[in-house]
Every structure is written in C-alpha cells, then in structure tokens.
Amino acid sequence: LELGGAPALEAWVRATMDGRLGSAFPDDGAAWWAWYMASTRVDTEVGFIRGLLGADIGPDLARIACPTLVITTQGSGLSTVEETRAWQQRIPQSRLEVLPGDSYHAAVTDAAECVRLTLAFLHEGT
C-alpha cells in the first residue's frame, strides 16, 4: 500500500470488500464504502493495519470493567462464532449477539439491528 499510494489503497479496499461487507450488501453501498475507505490517508491506513497485526488484546479482556455487548455474524471472516464467544466469555458482564450473514462489519451491514440490540442492552443497565 505504501508504495502504490492512493490508487493501491483503493484497489486493496475493492479487492477485500466482500469479506468486509458480506455477500448480501447492495453493490451501490459497497461502492460507496470503498470510496469512503479509499479517501483515508494512505499513511493512516497503513499505520492502522500495522497496529492491528501485532495487537493481542486477549490478556486485557478480563480488565474490561463496564457491561459489554459483543456483536458478530454467523459467517464473519475474522473469527468463528466459537472463537468470538471464547473471547466474549473472558469479559465480565458481557453478552454475545450473533446475527445472520457473512460480513465482519455488522454495524454497517446490519445497522438497524445493531442499534436495536445496543439500545436494548443499554436500557437493561438503567
């Protein structure tokens, strides 16, 4: 990405869009999301990816002190439901919600359902 600049970033974004947004997301929505992601500064995106590659938050999960809602999809390309559940169970006061689909950006692809689940979760704690 660094050597190719913005055109390489846009090509990478488009090539990886299916896993990010899943197979059911509308083409025009995916095109907009690709444009939006590709408008990020290349050095910002590269720095973000480098930070993710070396990140291991596993040891910190038990230190999360607030109620936590974890949302994933059945076919997320990032981790299986079982792997996500194993992480979620290490977070005190947490709950896992699994949505149908195969995206790993559920907040984008299933925004209305994520909002509904989040509001219900927040109201449970009040």
Each PLM stretch: what is its role?
Residues 75-79, 104:
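Acidic catalytic loop of the alpha/beta-hydrolase fold
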Residues 64-65, 126:
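Residue-level preference for short coil/turn positions at secondary-structure junctions
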Residues 57, 66, 80-89:
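Short alpha-helix in the alpha/beta-hydrolase fold that links the catalytic acid
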